[in-house]
């Protein structure tokens, strides 16, 4: 197949639309459903991300994309009982394979943003991963292959219309890439980033102790940022992105946005949230939205008289600002990556509030000394990679 016709482009008024290869065949097969323009943008960016994560870590990887940026990305490290509970898989009687764990983590970190995602998997989709995907609201999935059982499960999703794409894992694009804007063609060399043992070796802080898990987490942050709309910042812990701030014009706003997402991820593991008693039959999306409101500033939207009864069997106590701060202070060993340099130490001050201990960024600001000084104040380890990772 050299060409795939699309119903429309980014918007319904943008017709005709297609994807095609000028030379050779497309490296994909659409096994089920029909993919759209944005679906393919998500799929091809996501596939590159998980392929590189697998290469860098040796662990199966998954990502959850929305509007051409990842809402989550992870490798398949084991899940704790608490993580299974906050990701709504504690009731599943399945084998938690590394690939299934990777998607559970990628989807679970920011469930509000991942609603209606496009999934990318680094490895052949197995039955367990397909069963996890089956119960989530999602537009489609791309993977290098599917077991017969997995494909049967996925084909039944969305009344038989779920988009399933198989990509040739041996496909390599040309070293030069092009795109047209306003009738003008842009051309550039592909952004080739290779993470190895020396990538984070230029440590500029007093604390130079970088653990093996920290190296994995920093690698996840760098590769995730490579495929996130800039400016972007990514918090990672335990093999998964826990907060991604994408597409902001200000670096500090990226750090705050991603930090607030990381905080929400950690607050969901608090006794206050784990103890919530939801009404029977509440939908998964409503449960996610209720928790998001409960731990946020608009908590009275779900705690006011006449409202809480819609969501809870028992009215919860208010999760006070003091209680939330006390719980957030228990979060430690978080890794933070930035697609460009931090211009001021305020980014590090904000990162500290979300438990950051490890930082990777290109360096090169005229205020590098201030940023390093702020890291030293909190005993952080910071690496200057020398590589900017803008993505547009």
Language-model segments: which ranges?
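Active-site loops and adjacent core secondary-structure elements that bind or stabilize anionic groups
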Residues: 1-196, 214-232
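Gly-rich Lys/Arg/Thr-decorated short loops/hinges at beta-loop-alpha junctions or inter-strand turns
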Residues: 22-34, 109-115, 189-208, 285-307, ...
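Conserved helix-loop functional segments at active or binding sites
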Residues: 52, 227, 264-268, 353, ...
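Flexible, glycine/charged-enriched surface loops at secondary-structure junctions
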Residues: 56-64, 164-167, 230-237, 267-278, ...
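Active-site-proximal loop/turn and secondary-structure-junction residues that shape catalytic pockets
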Residues: 69, 125, 237-240, 248, ...
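C-terminal binding/interaction regions
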Residues: 71, 117, 121-122, 135-165, ...
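Glycine- and Gly-Pro-enriched alpha-helical subdomains that act as flexible
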Residues: 71-112, 242-341
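Internal active-site segments that recognize and position negatively charged phosphoryl groups
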Residues: 202-244
């Amino acid at each position: 197949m050299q060409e795939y016709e699309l119903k429309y482009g980014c918007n319904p008024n943008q017709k005709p639309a297609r994807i095609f290869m000028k030379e050779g065949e497309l490296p994909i097969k659409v096994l089920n459903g029909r993919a759209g323009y944005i679906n393919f943008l998500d799929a091809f960016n996501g596939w590159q991300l998980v392929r590189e994560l697998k290469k860098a870590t040796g662990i199966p990887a998954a990502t959850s994309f929305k509007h051409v940026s990842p809402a989550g990305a992870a490798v398949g490290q084991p899940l704790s009982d608490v993580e299974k509970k906050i990701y709504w898989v504690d009731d599943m009687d399945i084998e938690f394979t590394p690939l299934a764990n990777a998607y559970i983590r990628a989807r679970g970190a920011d469930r509000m943003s991942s609603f209606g995602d496009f999934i990318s998997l680094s490895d052949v989709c197995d039955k367990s991963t397909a069963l996890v995907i089956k119960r989530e609201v999602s537009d489609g999935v791309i993977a290098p292959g599917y077991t017969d059982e997995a494909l049967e499960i996925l084909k039944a999703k969305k009344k038989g219309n779920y988009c399933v794409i198989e990509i040739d894992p041996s496909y390599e694009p040309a070293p030069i890439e092009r795109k047209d804007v306003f009738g003008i063609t842009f051309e550039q060399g592909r952004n080739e980033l290779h993470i190895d043992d020396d990538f984070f070796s230029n440590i500029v802080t007093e604390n130079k102790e970088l653990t093996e898990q920290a190296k994995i987490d920093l690698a996840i942050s760098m590769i995730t940022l490579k495929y996130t709309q800039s400016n972007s910042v990514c918090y990672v812990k335990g093999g998964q992105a826990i907060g991604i701030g994408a597409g902001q014009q200000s670096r500090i706003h990226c750090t705050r946005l991603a930090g607030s997402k990381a905080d929400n991820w950690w607050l969901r593991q608090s006794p206050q949230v784990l103890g919530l008693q939801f009404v029977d039959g509440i939908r998964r999306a409503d449960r996610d939205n209720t928790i998001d409101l409960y731990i946020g500033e608009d908590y009275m939207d779900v705690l006011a008289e006449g409202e809480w009864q819609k969501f809870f069997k028992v009215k919860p106590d208010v999760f006070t600002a003091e209680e939330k701060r006390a719980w957030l202070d228990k979060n430690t060993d978080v890794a933070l990556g930035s697609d460009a340099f931090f211009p001021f130490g305020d980014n590090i001050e904000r990162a500290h509030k979300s438990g950051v201990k490890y930082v990777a960024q290109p360096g090169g600001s005229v205020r590098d000394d201030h940023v390093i000084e702020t890291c030293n104040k909190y005993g952080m380890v910071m690496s200057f990679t020398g590589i900017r990772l803008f993505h547009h």
